[in-house]
Amino acid sequence: PDTFSTKMVRFATRSPDGSAVVFESLGKLFIKKGDERPVRLTEHDTGFEYYPVWTPDGRQLVYMHWHDDALASLKSIDLKQGKSRSLLEAKGHYIEPSISSDGEHLVYRKLSGGRLRHGAFGERPGLYLLNLKSGENSFLRRDGADAHFVGDDIYFTDRKRPTGRNSDTAKTVLFAMDVTGNSVREIANGLLATQFRVSPNKRWVAFREHYQVFVSPMQQTGKSVPLGPKVKSLPTKKLSVNGGIYLNWSNENSLSWSTGPEMTTVTLGDAPFTEESATETINLSMQVETAKPSGTLALTHARIITMNAERDVIESGTIIVTDNRIEAVGASDEVEVPLGAQIVDAKGKTIIPGIIDAHAHGRYGEGEIIVENNWNTLAHLALGVTTQHNPSSSAKLAFASAEYTNTGQILSTRIFSTGEIVYGAKSRSFAPVDSVEDALSHIRRLKAQGAISIKNYNQPRREQRQQVIEAARQENMFVVAEGGSLYHMDMNLVVDGSTGIEHNVPALKMYNDVTQLWQATNVGYTPTLVVTYGGLTSEDYYYQQYNVWEHPILSNFVPPSVLRPRSVRRVMAPESEFRDDDAAAVAKTLMDNGVTVNIGAHGQREGLASHWEMWSFVRGGMSPMQALSAATINPATYLGMDADLGSIEPGKLADLVVLTKNPLENIEYSDDVSHVMINGRFYRADTLAEQVTGDRPAPKLWWR
């Protein structure tokens, strides 16, 4: 669509008097007052703005301004005058600022260097205190996160892990300390809690567990008080319906949280555990334009592997692209190039549809910082992966990155995701499901944030997995299921109506009982050969076959510190030890029986592994055309996107890969990429500098 409504609103925080809300969307901070439309907070035209926090008087906001080169700087802005000033400019990675009640001090967390972020300027990470009057900057402690002032104390959280053989399991602990970093004491703890927030009057403590928001009375007994929805020693009230993030108190008794674009505020009365509390919900979504080019481009005289229903191959063909969609495709002597169109002579080249990776875990940010140039997604794009579906990710990062991409804030693949998995194991990611209603709560939360799919991940009982499937059906979402290397569970998941099975079925052969059953369903199969169960994987195999660290495209984008360790110090083993070709042969059997089989590179090796998936499918018996189908039209169909993606046909989005050689002759030519087109924009593969359709320069990466 030409426009869309933003969903992944982040950092939403009410002003102290409750009259306004500040939030981040598309990398910029906005303020919304009452029913008025949101307005930009600053006039920064470069970089991204994160972590807004109000001063106690509500007259100023402190925030972090991010540049990939300059890194983080902490700034404040006077809301009346609209003027910004820098509070901390020393190069570093700063997040989570919080201001003292007297407005004189700022506590923040410094991160060490990152992988997507610059690897340096992270010396002595931890919690710091900045005196806003004198500018004195003091180190408080190494451990701790989510620090926030309450009165004269700083509260923060940390994980307390077992130290002895018979010790308790790890807990999330709420600590308090004074402004010097001393007098540290434990206040509360939760086995599965992910966030604590203390109210300004120290009467309440809000916490997040199982993705839901709870509140309990604050107890300062000198001992750590256990908190949780099932703890009986203190009254606890569940406040959210479909979960929430970004917990914040705006005054003594008003707690806010976000679920997608909606911000909910609950005002606790004198008896919140026996009476209903006043609740207000506002929608912070904005209608924004999708970025796309304008004009017409003709790619002429190329071999075109269309991946249409007939799998037509045009030996000397022309593709006409207008704006961001394919207008015409056919033999060059039959397709008329419009007057005024820009022309790219692709003689000798082969063009395939953009590769769609159906199971692509990826890094979209660190510490909720989405970088301007993400070498991970850029490497995927340079190698022809134009669409990624991530079946397990951080919703706050994946869906925000998708919106940044759709509006042209960053250059990236198309990003789709499940967000967080609906996980059945006891952990801080635990998503308990004991009814369809429980499943609906998780699914509605993820859908509100931007999910198109749900990851049904190791719920232990079959009825629980069925409840997730039924809830997803009610919400018109599709369900990808973690196979978990359990054959019988895989068969249950097929019979119960999952959209697809992720990871290979742990069997060396597939017989008629399974193929006849599976072909009677619409369940797809994404075996993720790069992480094959049962033996050495395709990733191991291709490290053995090639000097991957020397790949001319991959090595241009992936830092040597990331690329070289696994690829240089590689496993060497006899051919018989590898199981990716055996798993591929099983997938071939299913494909021959009508099952939709897809590539899914698991986020391994930054785009090149998507090609390894195809190569291993051919090693397992597929033809190159079948392997290309598994990388293009099959996943497009599987993900419900085949009306727009997956083949080179009129009306579809212009996502194309220009290859220097013909992969139908040798599938291992598929990674010899010359150019990539995504959404109608044309880029050199080796640098991702835009050509012909615009002049966007090659992305600048921190490590080179």
Show which residues each predicted segment covers.
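Conserved blade-ending motifs and adjacent loop-strand segments that build the rim/top face
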Residues: 188-193, 229-248
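Acidic, glycine-enriched loop/beta-strand segments at the rims
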Residues: 305-318, 331-333, 608, 623-628, ...
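Histidine-rich, glycine-flanked metal-binding segment
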Residues: 310-352
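Surface-exposed loop and turn segments in beta-propeller and other repeat-based domains
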Residues: 1-2, 221-238, 277-278, 282
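A flexible loop/linker signature enriched in serine peptidases of the S9 family
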Residues: 1, 5-7, 21-36, 43-49, ...
